[in-house]
From Swiss-Prot:
Protein name: Dihydropyrimidinase 1
Domain of life: Eukaryota
Cofactor: Zn(2+)
Classification via PANTHER family: DIHYDROPYRIMIDINASE 1, HYDRANTOINASE/DIHYDROPYRIMIDINASE FAMILY MEMBER
PTM comment, free text: Carboxylation allows a single lysine to coordinate two zinc ions.
Amino acid sequence: MSPPLVIKNGTVVNEDGMFKADVLVKNGIIVEVSPKIIALPEMEIIDATDRLVIPGGIDPHTHMQMPYAGEVTKDDFLRGTQAAVAGGTTMIIDFCCPDHRNGESLMAGYARWRSWADPKVCCDYGLSVAITQWRPETADQMAVITSPEFGVNSFKFYMAYEGTLMVRDDEMYRAMQECAKLRALARVHAENGSVIKEREIDLLAKGVTGPEGHTQSRPEEIEAEATNRACVLAAQANCPVYIVHVMTKGAAAAISHHRAQGSIVFGEPIAAGLALDGSHYYNEDWLHAARYVMSPPLSRDPTTPELLMKLLAAGELHLTGTDNCTYDGCQKSLGKGNFTKIPNGINGVEDRMSVVWEKGVHSGIIDPMRYVSITSATAAKIFNIYPKKGRIAVGSDADIVIFNPNATRTISAETHHHNLDFNIFEGIKCHGVAEITISRGRIVWANGQLQTVPGSGKFVPLLANSPFVFSSHEIREKKKEPRIVERLE
């Protein structure tokens, strides 16, 4: 157990306020937040003068060590969480994808992910489970895995990757009905996989084989249409829905429309979509272009990143993730001659906190309190771990970042901590640097050096029925009860 720790002279930032205060940590928990805490000899002292003391980031969207199509993502749970803490993130929510098509149950897939993660993680983590096929036993398995014993409160549905991960509309609707019963959140990758497949065939037949084919096979309307459809299906099932990696204006507009109709919809843009655009797919260097291949692709509209940040500021979008899913140059090169074979995925877990500060706070679009909301607090609320996570307060876990808003760093693959030979943010200069990262009261990053211990992070059960998501569910359910007309025979 780490010694007691006192953070002196900093400015505490929560989603609802900023104030000067010291912070005392004992046994991994914040035990006091007040001015001028007296440091005792046995305490470790951190001087946070001119620094912000913020909740550790929560990245709600990662794919560490994920097997897919014969490849495995390069960031395993060790390197991925090392990269996370180096950037100021102290918890990830990773996606577990059971091999449904070979008969693997949700529980068996969950156990496989836990066996990979538990010995390696350097920060806390939770799991979200993908449902890629509906079977007669799926509903029962969903009920089991949302129990406190397993601690899963969300399920992911892919509307893309036909033949592997994609679910049909009827399967997703049936699963959303079960989510509603279990008070579990539906999370959706919104694309039209059937149309994409046909467009891929057409493009290849016309000789389009390079990475530019990836974005051409996925027009922005495809994401907008699927986002709207996911929201419609969720509304019919009375199921709150969370749209992952919102990349385009049309998808964001669909979310805003359904929220205006009273639906419970959350939108998650990612660091890549807030900083980059799709011009990279047309780079003359094949490998450069391939490195940016992800789904949905980056927007071809260069004004989209700023608009997404403004929608975060306005509350029309709600939190930020990364979709950290790393494949190196050799893996990307498997798609030479056929863009559909390029593994989809990019980095982000290390750079999200700086990128969001640069594009949001330093650009004058959001304030530091909104920054905390979209990088940690809202995720903690959605996944039912607030205020244990996502807040600097007595009783909260001591997941804390000493953040220097005035420092700068230039992102580079030469200095990052990913197990990756490139960085999609290469050369971007960011204001806002996580100088010290504290996980459960233990310093894991300081002075530009990792101080991590594999396995020191813990699995955090994510319990169903988050009040932030489901507090109005029963009332909504009653309003949706069918009407029966009594008629004289």
